[in-house]
Protein backbone atom coordinates (compact mmCIF):
# COMPACT_ATOMS: atom_id res chain seq x y z
CA UNK A 1 0.00 0.00 0.00
CA UNK A 2 1.27 3.41 -0.99
CA UNK A 3 -0.09 6.52 0.70
CA UNK A 4 0.17 9.70 -1.34
CA UNK A 5 -0.16 13.17 0.08
CA UNK A 6 -1.12 16.01 -2.21
CA UNK A 7 0.90 19.18 -1.81
CA UNK A 8 2.10 22.09 -3.88
CA UNK A 9 5.55 21.71 -5.42
CA UNK A 10 7.40 24.99 -5.88
CA UNK A 11 10.16 24.33 -8.35
CA UNK A 12 12.97 26.85 -8.62
CA UNK A 13 14.27 27.57 -12.12
CA UNK A 14 17.43 29.48 -11.17
CA UNK A 15 20.94 28.06 -10.80
CA UNK A 16 24.49 29.37 -10.93
CA UNK A 17 28.10 28.32 -11.36
CA UNK A 18 31.43 30.09 -11.04
CA UNK A 19 33.02 29.66 -14.48
CA UNK A 20 36.36 31.28 -13.66
CA UNK A 21 37.83 33.70 -11.16
CA UNK A 22 35.52 36.72 -11.23
CA UNK A 23 33.07 35.26 -13.78
CA UNK A 24 29.66 33.97 -12.67
CA UNK A 25 27.20 32.04 -14.85
CA UNK A 26 23.52 32.33 -13.89
CA UNK A 27 20.87 30.21 -15.63
CA UNK A 28 17.24 31.32 -15.40
CA UNK A 29 15.17 28.74 -17.28
CA UNK A 30 11.80 30.25 -16.26
CA UNK A 31 10.40 33.03 -14.11
CA UNK A 32 7.52 30.97 -12.83
CA UNK A 33 7.09 32.37 -9.33
CA UNK A 34 8.48 34.77 -6.76
CA UNK A 35 10.63 31.83 -5.61
CA UNK A 36 12.68 32.33 -8.77
CA UNK A 37 13.21 36.00 -7.92
CA UNK A 38 14.19 35.04 -4.37
CA UNK A 39 16.68 32.46 -5.66
CA UNK A 40 18.11 34.96 -8.15
CA UNK A 41 18.35 37.66 -5.47
CA UNK A 42 20.21 35.32 -3.13
CA UNK A 43 22.70 34.44 -5.87
CA UNK A 44 23.11 38.09 -6.84
CA UNK A 45 23.73 39.22 -3.28
CA UNK A 46 26.48 36.59 -2.94
CA UNK A 47 28.50 37.93 -5.89
CA UNK A 48 30.53 40.56 -3.98
CA UNK A 49 31.91 37.87 -1.66
CA UNK A 50 33.17 36.04 -4.77
CA UNK A 51 34.79 39.20 -6.15
CA UNK A 52 32.62 38.82 -9.25
CA UNK A 53 33.36 41.28 -12.05
CA UNK A 54 31.41 39.75 -14.95
CA UNK A 55 28.13 37.85 -15.19
CA UNK A 56 26.78 35.59 -17.92
CA UNK A 57 22.98 35.50 -17.65
CA UNK A 58 21.54 32.59 -19.64
CA UNK A 59 17.92 33.14 -20.72
CA UNK A 60 17.95 30.67 -23.60
CA UNK A 61 14.79 28.60 -23.71
CA UNK A 62 13.16 30.76 -21.04
CA UNK A 63 9.50 31.13 -22.02
CA UNK A 64 8.84 33.87 -19.48
CA UNK A 65 6.60 34.05 -16.44
CA UNK A 66 5.99 36.81 -13.91
CA UNK A 67 6.46 40.35 -15.19
CA UNK A 68 7.15 41.89 -11.78
CA UNK A 69 9.82 39.28 -10.99
CA UNK A 70 11.52 39.97 -14.34
CA UNK A 71 11.51 43.70 -13.60
CA UNK A 72 13.04 43.09 -10.16
CA UNK A 73 15.87 41.16 -11.83
CA UNK A 74 16.37 43.95 -14.38
CA UNK A 75 16.46 46.55 -11.61
CA UNK A 76 19.31 44.98 -9.63
CA UNK A 77 21.37 44.72 -12.84
CA UNK A 78 20.84 48.33 -13.99
CA UNK A 79 23.50 50.70 -12.59
CA UNK A 80 21.87 53.95 -13.74
CA UNK A 81 19.34 55.50 -11.36
CA UNK A 82 15.86 56.42 -12.65
CA UNK A 83 16.41 54.67 -15.98
CA UNK A 84 13.16 53.51 -17.58
CA UNK A 85 13.19 49.72 -17.43
CA UNK A 86 9.90 48.96 -19.17
CA UNK A 87 6.25 49.85 -19.42
CA UNK A 88 3.19 47.65 -19.05
CA UNK A 89 0.26 49.07 -21.00
CA UNK A 90 -3.15 47.88 -19.83
CA UNK A 91 -6.50 48.90 -21.28
CA UNK A 92 -7.41 52.46 -20.29
CA UNK A 93 -10.20 51.20 -18.03
CA UNK A 94 -7.66 48.94 -16.28
CA UNK A 95 -5.10 51.62 -15.47
CA UNK A 96 -3.39 52.45 -18.76
CA UNK A 97 0.42 52.62 -18.86
CA UNK A 98 2.48 51.63 -15.81
CA UNK A 99 6.20 52.39 -16.07
CA UNK A 100 9.01 51.02 -13.92
CA UNK A 101 12.26 52.88 -13.22
CA UNK A 102 15.56 51.66 -11.79
CA UNK A 103 16.79 52.45 -8.30
CA UNK A 104 20.45 52.52 -9.39
CA UNK A 105 21.69 50.12 -6.72
CA UNK A 106 23.34 47.63 -9.09
CA UNK A 107 26.65 45.96 -8.33
CA UNK A 108 29.75 47.61 -9.87
CA UNK A 109 30.37 44.92 -12.48
CA UNK A 110 32.61 45.27 -15.52
CA UNK A 111 30.28 43.36 -17.84
CA UNK A 112 26.95 41.55 -18.07
CA UNK A 113 26.32 39.27 -21.03
CA UNK A 114 22.83 37.89 -21.68
CA UNK A 115 22.43 34.73 -23.77
CA UNK A 116 19.16 34.53 -25.76
CA UNK A 117 17.62 32.41 -28.52
CA UNK A 118 14.32 31.70 -30.26
CA UNK A 119 12.99 30.14 -27.07
CA UNK A 120 13.46 33.34 -25.06
CA UNK A 121 9.97 34.83 -24.76
CA UNK A 122 7.60 37.12 -22.88
CA UNK A 123 8.90 38.16 -19.43
CA UNK A 124 12.35 36.78 -20.30
CA UNK A 125 12.40 39.07 -23.36
CA UNK A 126 11.29 41.91 -21.08
CA UNK A 127 14.30 41.26 -18.84
CA UNK A 128 16.76 40.93 -21.74
CA UNK A 129 15.36 43.89 -23.67
CA UNK A 130 15.36 46.15 -20.63
CA UNK A 131 19.03 45.41 -19.98
CA UNK A 132 19.80 45.96 -23.66
CA UNK A 133 17.92 49.26 -23.97
CA UNK A 134 19.43 50.73 -20.80
CA UNK A 135 22.93 49.71 -21.92
CA UNK A 136 23.32 47.51 -18.87
CA UNK A 137 24.15 44.32 -20.78
CA UNK A 138 25.19 42.90 -24.13
CA UNK A 139 22.83 40.39 -25.76
CA UNK A 140 24.44 37.42 -27.50
CA UNK A 141 22.66 34.69 -29.47
CA UNK A 142 19.82 34.55 -31.99
CA UNK A 143 16.60 36.54 -32.40
CA UNK A 144 14.12 35.96 -29.60
CA UNK A 145 10.58 34.59 -29.90
CA UNK A 146 8.63 37.85 -30.05
CA UNK A 147 5.91 37.69 -27.39
CA UNK A 148 5.24 41.16 -26.02
CA UNK A 149 1.58 40.85 -25.11
CA UNK A 150 -0.28 39.23 -22.23
CA UNK A 151 -3.55 37.35 -22.53
CA UNK A 152 -6.40 36.22 -20.29
CA UNK A 153 -7.77 32.74 -21.06
CA UNK A 154 -11.44 31.90 -20.51
CA UNK A 155 -12.72 28.32 -20.79
CA UNK A 156 -16.17 28.21 -22.42
CA UNK A 157 -18.86 25.68 -21.55
CA UNK A 158 -18.64 24.07 -25.01
CA UNK A 159 -14.97 23.30 -24.51
CA UNK A 160 -13.65 26.18 -26.58
CA UNK A 161 -11.27 28.76 -25.15
CA UNK A 162 -11.57 32.54 -25.43
CA UNK A 163 -8.26 34.40 -25.39
CA UNK A 164 -8.36 38.15 -24.70
CA UNK A 165 -5.27 40.36 -24.94
CA UNK A 166 -5.17 42.45 -21.77
CA UNK A 167 -1.73 44.07 -21.76
CA UNK A 168 1.21 45.05 -23.94
CA UNK A 169 4.83 45.20 -22.82
CA UNK A 170 6.96 48.13 -23.98
CA UNK A 171 10.71 48.68 -23.84
CA UNK A 172 12.13 52.21 -23.50
CA UNK A 173 13.76 52.21 -26.96
CA UNK A 174 12.38 49.24 -28.88
CA UNK A 175 8.76 49.59 -27.82
CA UNK A 176 6.61 46.47 -28.03
CA UNK A 177 8.37 43.52 -29.67
CA UNK A 178 5.26 41.40 -30.29
CA UNK A 179 5.76 39.33 -33.46
CA UNK A 180 9.20 40.89 -34.00
CA UNK A 181 11.49 39.65 -31.25
CA UNK A 182 14.72 41.16 -29.98
CA UNK A 183 17.85 41.28 -32.11
CA UNK A 184 21.02 40.47 -30.12
CA UNK A 185 23.98 42.84 -30.20
CA UNK A 186 26.13 39.87 -31.24
CA UNK A 187 24.28 37.28 -33.31
CA UNK A 188 25.39 33.68 -32.85
CA UNK A 189 23.53 30.42 -33.30
CA UNK A 190 23.35 27.92 -30.46
CA UNK A 191 26.04 25.28 -30.43
CA UNK A 192 26.99 22.60 -27.97
CA UNK A 193 30.52 22.68 -26.63
CA UNK A 194 31.81 20.24 -24.05
CA UNK A 195 34.69 21.71 -22.11
CA UNK A 196 36.70 20.38 -19.22
CA UNK A 197 37.46 23.60 -17.36
CA UNK A 198 40.38 21.88 -15.65
CA UNK A 199 42.13 21.89 -19.04
CA UNK A 200 41.92 25.68 -19.31
CA UNK A 201 44.90 27.77 -18.33
CA UNK A 202 44.29 29.67 -15.07
CA UNK A 203 42.98 33.18 -15.69
CA UNK A 204 45.10 35.76 -13.85
CA UNK A 205 42.74 38.72 -13.48
CA UNK A 206 45.36 40.78 -11.63
CA UNK A 207 47.45 41.14 -14.80
CA UNK A 208 46.84 44.12 -17.10
CA UNK A 209 46.96 42.96 -20.72
CA UNK A 210 47.87 45.36 -23.53
CA UNK A 211 47.82 45.25 -27.31
CA UNK A 212 50.90 43.45 -28.59
CA UNK A 213 51.47 41.39 -25.44
CA UNK A 214 52.42 37.72 -25.77
CA UNK A 215 51.90 35.61 -22.66
CA UNK A 216 50.09 32.73 -21.01
CA UNK A 217 47.69 35.28 -19.55
CA UNK A 218 46.66 36.32 -23.07
CA UNK A 219 46.21 32.68 -24.03
CA UNK A 220 44.04 32.03 -20.97
CA UNK A 221 41.82 34.98 -21.85
CA UNK A 222 41.46 33.99 -25.50
CA UNK A 223 40.56 30.42 -24.52
CA UNK A 224 37.45 31.79 -22.86
CA UNK A 225 36.70 34.23 -25.68
CA UNK A 226 36.86 31.39 -28.19
CA UNK A 227 34.43 29.33 -26.09
CA UNK A 228 32.00 32.25 -26.31
CA UNK A 229 32.35 32.20 -30.08
CA UNK A 230 34.12 35.57 -30.21
CA UNK A 231 37.36 34.05 -31.55
CA UNK A 232 37.95 31.08 -33.84
CA UNK A 233 40.81 29.81 -31.67
CA UNK A 234 42.91 30.70 -28.66
CA UNK A 235 46.17 32.55 -29.15
CA UNK A 236 48.97 33.79 -26.94
CA UNK A 237 49.35 37.12 -28.75
CA UNK A 238 47.12 40.14 -28.13
CA UNK A 239 46.54 41.12 -31.77
CA UNK A 240 43.78 42.96 -33.63
CA UNK A 241 41.41 39.99 -33.64
CA UNK A 242 41.76 39.64 -29.88
CA UNK A 243 41.19 43.37 -29.40
CA UNK A 244 37.97 43.15 -31.44
CA UNK A 245 36.80 40.14 -29.41
CA UNK A 246 37.48 41.96 -26.13
CA UNK A 247 35.56 45.00 -27.38
CA UNK A 248 32.61 42.78 -28.38
CA UNK A 249 32.60 41.11 -24.96
Question: Where do the model's predicted regions map?
Answer:
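BRCT (BRCA1 C-terminal) domain core and associated BRCT-interaction motifs
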Residues: 139-140, 144-162, 167-172, 242
